[in-house]
C-alpha cells in the first residue's frame, strides 16, 4: 500500500494545533489506513485530502482515527479523527482510496451470444474503485459461458456480462 507521504506531512503542518508537533498523529493515520485496507484485491494507493484550515480544535495529546458508521474504505470517502487524550472533539478528513488490480479487458467489440476466446481480451491493471463490482480478474469464470450482452472494446469484462451457454 502506498500513502502519499507528502500528504501526511501537509496534513500535519495544517493541523499542527490538533496534536503536539509530532509524527505520532501521522503514524496513527498511516497505521489505521494500512490496517483498514489490508486484504483488498490489489495494489492500494491512498490520497489524503487537505483539511479545512479554518478548523482549529483545541490541542490534543493523541489523535485517534476511526471509520464513520456508513463509510467504507473504497474510492472517495472520509475517515474520522477524534481527540483521545485531551479536549473532546472530532473531525473528518477526506481520503481517496485507489485499488489497482489486473482485470480482463475486451480487445475489440464483443457480440452477445459468443463464447470468450483468448484473443478477445487482454489483462490490464485498472483502478477497481472507478468501476462497478464484479469485474473479471480470472478468465476461468467465462469457461462454458457466453456473452449475455455486447461489450465494447477497451471495457472491462464483468460477471453479469456472461450467462451459461445454451445446450442443444
Task: Name what the model sees in each region.
Residues 7-17:
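Bacterial N-terminal signal peptides
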Residues 2-3, 17-168:
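Mature, extracytoplasmic segments of signal peptide-bearing proteins
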Amino acid at each position: 500500500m502506498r500513502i502519499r507521504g507528502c500528504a501526511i506531512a501537509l496534513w500535519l503542518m495544517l493541523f499542527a494545533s490538533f496534536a503536539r508537533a509530532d509524527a505520532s498523529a501521522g503514524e496513527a493515520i498511516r497505521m489505521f489506513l494500512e490496517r483498514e485496507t489490508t486484504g483488498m484485491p490489489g495494489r492500494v494507493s491512498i490520497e489524503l485530502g487537505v483539511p479545512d484550515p479554518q478548523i482549529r480544535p483545541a490541542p490534543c495529546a493523541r489523535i485517534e482515527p476511526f471509520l464513520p458508521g456508513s463509510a467504507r474504505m473504497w474510492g472517495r470517502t472520509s475517515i474520522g479523527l477524534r481527540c483521545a487524550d485531551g479536549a473532546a472533539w472530532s473531525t473528518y478528513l477526506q481520503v481517496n482510496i485507489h485499488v489497482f488490480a489486473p482485470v480482463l479487458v475486451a480487445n475489440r467489440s464483443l457480440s452477445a451470444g459468443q463464447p470468450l476466446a483468448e484473443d478477445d481480451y487482454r489483462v490490464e491493471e485498472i483502478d477497481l474503485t472507478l468501476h462497478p463490482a464484479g469485474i473479471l480478474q480470472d478468465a476461468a469464470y467465462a469457461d462454458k459461458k457466453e456473452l449475455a450482452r455486447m461489450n465494447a472494446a477497451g471495457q472491462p469484462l464483468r460477471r453479469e456480462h456472461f450467462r451459461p451457454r445454451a445446450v442443444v
